[in-house]
């Protein structure tokens, strides 16, 4: 399960499936598949814990998300939000249960830091020549960005800040 979690995290952070040159070459959605593989390993794991206070809060948030769409008259929006938010809930459950030892937490932190270093190297190249190896240009002519969820320079900066020890 832990290896699948690390591969999923690599796909979330490095995002090779979102590189413009590679978008059409991946036939299958790698990131959701890797999350499902990690979840299957978690299902067969003997240690499942749901006693952390974050679980009821997450469930409450999920319910409010659905009910708010229903009360706004858009029941289809509730169904759409299940599809968008369910992977977030699943990733939380898998990671919360899979990171049960200090050594695993340190390895995941190392993956975060190494991925941030890769994205920083991309930003350096992007700043020097105007475009990074992903094919993404500078945002607003001066701000580095990456692909996918890090297309917003502020989100990319938050990753960098989160990885500072």
Predicted region positions:
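Transmembrane signal-anchor hairpin modules in multi-pass inner-membrane enzymes, especially those
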Residues: 1-67, 73-80, 100-114
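Conserved catalytic core of Hanks-type protein kinase domains
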Residues: 13, 85, 98, 127
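Alpha-helical transmembrane segments and their membrane-interface exit regions
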Residues: 36-41, 86-93
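Membrane-embedded glycan-lipid processing machinery
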Residues: 75-79, 83, 146-153
């Amino acid at each position: 399960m832990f290896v699948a979690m690390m591969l999923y995290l690599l796909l979330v952070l490095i995002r090779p499936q979102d590189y413009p040159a590679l978008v059409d070459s991946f036939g299958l959605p790698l990131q959701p598949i890797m999350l499902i593989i990690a979840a299957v390993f978690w299902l067969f794991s003997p240690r499942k814990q749901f006693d952390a206070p974050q679980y009821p809060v997450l469930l409450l948030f999920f319910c409010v998300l659905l009910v708010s769409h229903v009360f706004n008259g858009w029941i289809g929006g509730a169904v759409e939000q299940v599809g968008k938010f369910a992977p977030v809930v699943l990733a939380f459950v898998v990671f919360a249960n899979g990171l049960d030892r200090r050594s695993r937490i340190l390895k995941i932190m190392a993956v975060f830091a190494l991925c941030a270093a890769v994205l920083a190297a991309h930003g350096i190249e992007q700043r020097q020549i105007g475009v990074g190896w992903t094919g993404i240009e500078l945002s607003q002519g001066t701000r580095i960005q990456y692909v996918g969820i890090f297309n917003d320079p502020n989100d990319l900066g938050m990753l960098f800040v989160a990885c500072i020890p």
